[in-house]
């Protein structure tokens, strides 16, 4: 099994594509990267609505709130974690994984806090961790310690591939904004648990995106044999994310026939 989705399920420009709700999005994709929870907890009635708009085979991959990962730096935040997991509990059977997006200031010295945090989490969910500190990409003892600790706990190391957006010509504000915000870190395709999560940050150059994505075809085919990967496709202007899906899908299908036909979303160019 492989899960493929986008960083969010709605965008004003997707309305003309027929994607007007989570329910409609879930007809095309089997998972979503839940960025909204990084910034605020959804209201209880909203969580219930999300449950009503999806089926049991759909998966959410929500980020832990920034109040936990950034402001508390994983320390003394048991109440915040309990509040978050309780709020999301109506969706428990549909959680692909909860994951931490740690800031670049969270380095090797903070690993004891990470281990304590992960060890205190309930065991019924899968978890992931995205790191951004340079030493965790230097292939030294610090990175080995990180990978070993995640592996021992069965926690996925979230993989960020931002090569396309940083290789792009900065000709638009969307590109420039993404280049400022998305970390420029090496791509370390490390498998530490059974649900590897890949965040592919494309540019607005679909030819380049396809070229840079080729390395993932072999890796996904390999991992698919023993794990359940998650692939999330980003573009600087999220309005273009469905176009990236169309660009990469046939290559993915040749490698992983089980994903079936490309989602039946009209391409932007066909609407005018």
UniProtKB/Swiss-Prot annotation:
SUPFAM superfamilies: TM1631-like. Disulfide bonds: none annotated. It comes from the Bacteria. Pfam families: DUF72 (PF01904). InterPro entries: DUF72, UPF0759_sf. Gene3D superfamilies: Protein of unknown function UPF0759 (3.20.20.410). Belongs to the UPF0759 family. PANTHER family: UNCHARACTERIZED PROTEIN YECE, UPF0759 PROTEIN YECE. This is UPF0759 protein YecE. It comes from Escherichia coli (strain K12). The lineage of its organism: Bacteria, Pseudomonadati, Pseudomonadota, Gammaproteobacteria, Enterobacterales. The gene is yecE.
């Amino acid at each position: 099994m492989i899960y493929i989705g986008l960083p969010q399920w709605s965008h004003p420009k997707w309305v003309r594509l027929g994607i007007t709700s989570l329910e409609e999005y879930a007809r095309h994709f089997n998972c979503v990267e839940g960025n909204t929870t990084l910034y605020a907890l959804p209201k209880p009635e909203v969580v219930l609505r999300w449950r009503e708009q999806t089926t049991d085979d759909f998966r959410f991959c929500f980020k832990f709130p920034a109040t936990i990962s950034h402001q508390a730096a994983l320390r003394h935040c048991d109440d915040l974690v309990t509040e978050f997991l309780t709020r999301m509990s109506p969706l428990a059977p549909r959680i692909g994984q909860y994951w931490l997006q740690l800031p670049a200031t969270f380095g090797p010295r903070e690993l004891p806090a990470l281990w304590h945090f992960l060890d205190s989490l309930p065991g019924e969910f899968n978890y992931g961790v995205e790191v951004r500190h340079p030493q965790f990409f230097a292939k030294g003892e610090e990175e080995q310690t990180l990978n070993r600790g995640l592996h021992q706990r069965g926690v996925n190391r979230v993989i960020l591939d931002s090569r396309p957006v940083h290789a792009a010509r900065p000709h638009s504000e969307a590109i420039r904004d993404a280049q400022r915000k998305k970390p420029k870190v090496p791509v370390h395709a490390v498998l530490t648990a059974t649900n590897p999560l890949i965040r592919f940050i494309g540019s607005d150059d679909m030819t380049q995106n396809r070229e840079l994505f080729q390395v993932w075809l072999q890796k996904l085919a390999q991992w698919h044999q023993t794990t359940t990967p998650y692939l999330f496709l980003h573009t600087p202007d999220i309005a273009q994310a469905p176009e990236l899906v169309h660009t990469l899908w046939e290559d993915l299908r040749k490698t992983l026939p089980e994903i079936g036909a490309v989602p039946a979303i009209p391409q932007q160019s066909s609407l005018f």
